[in-house]
């Protein structure tokens, strides 16, 4: 049976390819999302993408996720650093989450070094650009969840 994975993207990730190209690169968000879906298909995973700039909308998707998906790949954006509500929502559902960041958050501004959401996740991938989403999918494909 094909695994189903939600790619959950937080605030400002719709602007990838437009903002801070030196950090996030020049490939736009839509292309990255399409590439992640194609990669998922190639390894037997159906990927659905949801992006929102609103914390509550992300929490609502997390609440729904456990009845639909086998796992969630989450890039909470800046919410990573302070959203205990996202942390609690992740802990509140019984499916694995993998936190992914395109940039290496530990090489950036000091306030970005701490993730309050990562402790609620199976693991964190950071610093490999959009390839990080594929790395997370590979882990999900190779692991009994």
Regions found by a protein language model. Give the residues of each.
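Short acidic active-site motifs
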Residues: 57-61
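Short, acidic/small-residue loops that bind anionic groups at enzyme active sites
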Residues: 91-108
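Extreme N-terminal starter segment of soluble prokaryotic enzymes
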Residues: 2-5
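Short acidic/histidine-rich motifs immediately flanking catalytic phosphotransfer sites
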Residues: 65-72
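Short beta->alpha junction loops
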Residues: 48-56
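Short, glycine-/small-residue-rich phosphate/pyrophosphate-handling segment
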Residues: 107-145
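Short glycine-rich anion-binding loops that position phosphate/pyrophosphate groups of nucleotides
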Residues: 11-13, 77-80, 103-105
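Glycine- and acidic-residue-enriched helix-capping/strand-helix junction motifs
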Residues: 16-30
């Amino acid at each position: 049976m094909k695994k189903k994975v939600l790619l959950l993207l937080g605030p400002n990730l719709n602007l990838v390819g437009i903002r801070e190209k030196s950090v996030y690169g020049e490939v736009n968000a839509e292309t990255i999302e399409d590439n992640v879906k194609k990669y998922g298909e190639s390894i037997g995973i159906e990927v659905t993408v949801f992006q929102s700039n609103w914390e509550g909308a992300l929490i609502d998707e997390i609440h729904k996720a456990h009845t639909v998906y086998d796992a969630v790949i989450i890039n909470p954006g800046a919410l990573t650093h302070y959203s205990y509500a996202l942390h609690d929502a992740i802990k509140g559902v019984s499916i694995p989450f993998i936190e992914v960041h395109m940039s290496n958050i530990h090489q950036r501004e000091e306030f970005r070094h701490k993730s309050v959401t990562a402790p609620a996740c199976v693991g964190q991938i950071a610093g490999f650009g959009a390839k990080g989403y594929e790395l997370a999918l590979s882990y999900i494909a190779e692991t009994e969840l």
